[in-house]
Amino acid sequence: MHRLYPLVLLMLFVYGAAAGEQAMLARVTVYWHSPGSKERIAASGRLLRDGHCAVDPKKIPYGSKIVLPDDQLIAVDTGPAVVQRTAALRSARTPAQRKAIVIDRYFESRREAQSWAASHPNFMTVWVDSPEWAGVNLSEAD
């Protein structure tokens, strides 16, 4: 899979340039629903589900589409570790990685989250398509 990343990134670059998306270096972390907790409500008020993620809403507005090399997510949540970029600062090896945004990908289970994290690099280039940038009403974005 890792051999395909350069090709996928090139394809995303061509698509992103045409669609007006913005490329960003991101430290992608994972979180999951705790079996004992009742609520799965995100900071945006939406019910969390697979395909959602937490972002810094000052950098990536809620409702934005996040395109990873092998999937797409919707920004609906946030948290202090995401805003403070804790994971990027702790695991960075280069100046670019120290400046990376953090995207925290939501999974329904711990097993799914850990499996995905183990099979993907910590840092990756993502494409962000914001409803604000595309002129889409945020309340209509999913």
Regions found by a protein language model. Give the residues of each.
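Sec-dependent signal peptide recognition
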Residues: 2-9
